[in-house]
Amino acid sequence: MRTLINMDGAEHAEFRRLTQDWFMPQNLKTLEAKVTEIAETFVDRMLAMGGECDFVSDIAIWYPLRVIMMILGVPEKDEALMLKLTQEIFGSEDPDMQREGTDEERMQFMMDFFMYFTQMTADRRANPGDDVASVIANAVIDGQPIGDMEALGYYV
């Protein structure tokens, strides 16, 4: 599977163009209120903790995740799963982030990630919304819809 990070030149530009409109200043303006609302939720959470918290585990890992999930269109109910999968993917060398069990069991996180986003892609193809996942799911390159693997590469 190829991701934007692994692409160069024209291929990278072509895939980047699929979602770049979402990140143009006029569209970021529309996201600003939602991002501010999420930030206020986390400020309220800190206040409810009496002004003291473990900033990393209580705020720093959750706030950016919630913003990214909102942009993608991932429901908040899946937040714990998304954190777990994100930590397993990007912290795969960190023993604290790895699953227990055999090598096969520990690698199951990739299948869980792929299954989640394959289902999400299928849903957005059938029911497009106003989110980046819908843009990715319904993207066309060279006159052809992108395949599931190309779409999955975008989520990584």
Give residue ranges: language-model regions.
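Cytochrome P450
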Residues: M1-V156
